Curated annotation (Swiss-Prot):
The keyword Transcription regulation applies. Belongs to the transcriptional regulatory CopG/NikR family. InterPro entries: Acetolactate_synth/TF_NikR_C, ACT-like_dom_sf, Arc_rbn_hlx_hlx, CopG, CopG/NikR_regulator, Ni_resp_reg_NikR, Ribbon_hlx_hlx, TF_NikR_Ni-bd_C. Its cofactor is Ni(2+). This is Putative nickel-responsive regulator. It comes from Helicobacter pylori (strain G27). The keyword Transcription regulation applies.
Length: 148
């Protein structure tokens, strides 16, 4: 029989907040469809852990994962090739790309990246700075261990 691992258990703790902050928390729960305050707080903690993980400046840490979403004018001359060249030249691993034709003028591309935070963010800035790129947003992720 397996004995429960301390890390697998849910720990209950209390938090003291001002009323206006609690009201904001409750409004966010309703707005985002959370089932409880605990669910929202867990998500907020996870988000902060990812943010802190990305802030750690370790050039040898290649474990960062991100998705770069790019919207661009596909009529812009040689833009697609320049985006590909930047990806190939970067120190970041491009794990996957997906290309979608949004309309007659615009394409959306998602680029899944793995590497260190500096190289990933540099790639975002390089692609985002190209003429014809209308939007370039990086969503950062991290693979820290946690239980649902």
């Amino acid at each position: 029989m397996d004995t429960p691992n301390k890390d697998d258990s849910i720990i209950r703790f209390s938090v003291s907040l001002q009323q206006n902050l609690l009201d904001e928390l409750d409004n966010r729960i309703i707005k985002n469809g959370y089932s409880s305050r605990s669910e929202l707080v867990r998500d907020m903690i996870r988000e902060k852990l990812v943010e802190d993980n990305w802030a750690e400046d370790n050039p040898n840490d290649e474990s960062k994962i991100a998705v770069l979403v790019v919207i661009y004018d596909h009529h812009q001359r040689e833009l697609n090739q320049r985006m590909i060249d930047i990806q190939h030249a970067s120190g970041t691993h491009v794990l996957c790309t997906t290309h979608i034709h949004m309309d007659e003028h615009n394409c959306l591309e998602t680029i899944i990246l793995q590497g260190n935070s500096f190289e990933i963010q540099r790639l975002q800035l390089e692609i985002g700075g190209l003429r014809g790129v209308k939007f370039a947003k990086l969503t950062k992720a991290s693979s820290f261990e946690h239980n649902e």
